[in-house]
Amino acid sequence: MTMNMFEQFMSPELLMIPTALLSMLVPVLLIHHNPKLLGNRMTTAIAWLLMTIMSNMTNQLTPSGQKWCQVLTSLLLMILLSNLLGLLPYTFTSTSQLSMNMAMAIPLWMATIITGMTKKPSITLAHMLPEGSPTPLIPFMIIIETISLLMRPLALGVRLTANITAGHLLMTMVSTTTLNFITSHITLSIMTYLLLFLLCILELAVACIQAYVFVLLIILYLQENT
């Protein structure tokens, strides 16, 4: 029976009960914080690294935008852990689902727009018309900028989904090729295994980079509206 490479992206079921929600909540359960307990060196190093990254990403925000730091940090951790846990064998990658990524992108994008319209409506509306636009082109520029604005959450969700899905499909194809070559071509199987090892390292980097890019774009949208 031929294996479908896209079966790994289907929602897992247990006794005909979808367990996708449970897999999405696993990264949240891994984030445990108890101020009464002192962390070890690893947790201290991770906390310091996370604080350094978030401070560098949000240092250009206004004081009102700094209030988003906790939400953005939680979002970064959730996407990062979902991407990394999805690299484990026999696991479900929740960030490979466009529905989940859009469920994260659309509310956050809408929140930045609402924040800008309530606090700086004139500046927010001014983004619809670039400065110095010729008078005859003003209606077309407004339409183009509006479409560009509406495409932002779609770009956020599709970018994350496409990168995670492409990486998993490539790993599936290389690992299947390695398995098929083990009994017939040992040399080729070793070469493809080395390729798979390098690909796993690349996917670890992609998992971290995509979480960083997703949150960074939200911060840039927030910076425009605060």
Swiss-Prot record:
Keywords: ATP synthesis, CF(0), Hydrogen ion transport, Ion transport, Membrane, Mitochondrion, Mitochondrion inner membrane, Transmembrane, Transmembrane helix, Transport
Predominant location category: mitochondrion
GO terms under cellular component: mitochondrial inner membrane; proton-transporting ATP synthase complex
One Pfam family cited in the UniProt record for this chain: ATP-synt_A
Coiled coil regions, renumbered to chain: none
GO terms, molecular function: proton channel activity; proton-transporting ATP synthase activity, rotational mechanism
GO BP field: proton motive force-driven ATP synthesis; proton transmembrane transport
Catalytic activity line of the entry: H(+)(in) = H(+)(out)
Membrane topology label: Multi-pass membrane protein
Transmembrane regions: 11-31, 37-54, 72-92, 98-118, 138-158, 178-198, 199-219
Intracellular or extracellular location(s): Mitochondrion inner membrane
Cross-referenced NCBIfam families: ATP_synt_6_or_A
Family: Belongs to the ATPase A chain family.
Subunit structure: Component of the ATP synthase complex composed at least of ATP5F1A/subunit alpha, ATP5F1B/subunit beta, ATP5MC1/subunit c (homooctomer), MT-ATP6/subunit a, MT-ATP8/subunit 8, ATP5ME/subunit e, ATP5MF/subunit f, ATP5MG/subunit g, ATP5MK/subunit k, ATP5MJ/subunit j, ATP5F1C/subunit gamma, ATP5F1D/subunit delta, ATP5F1E/subunit epsilon, ATP5PF/subunit F6, ATP5PB/subunit b, ATP5PD/subunit d, ATP5PO/subunit OSCP.
Role according to the record: Subunit a, of the mitochondrial membrane ATP synthase complex (F(1)F(0) ATP synthase or Complex V) that produces ATP from ADP in the presence of a proton gradient across the membrane which is generated by electron transport complexes of the respiratory chain. ATP synthase complex consist of a soluble F(1) head domain - the catalytic core - and a membrane F(1) domain - the membrane proton channel. These two domains are linked by a central stalk rotating inside the F(1) region and a stationary peripheral stalk.
Family matches, as PANTHER family: ATP SYNTHASE SUBUNIT A
Name by which UniProt lists this protein: ATP synthase F(0) complex subunit a
